[in-house]
């Protein structure tokens, strides 16, 4: 199992979509939400994802295809 930390930034068109639910359900990725901020027109979430390396790669590719910006987090998001 591989664990990674990422920040997901959602465009307005995806704010109401169950993106994280689909990530967990469709890709069997374990997530841990560390911090988030969601407004009517913008949202982001910092989270840890854990799964097999190829599963994480597929999940991240799917997020990007949907229009989610995926940025790696190098340090702990809880400070």
Regions found by a protein language model. Give the residues of each.
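Long, contiguous binding/interaction regions
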Residues: 1-79
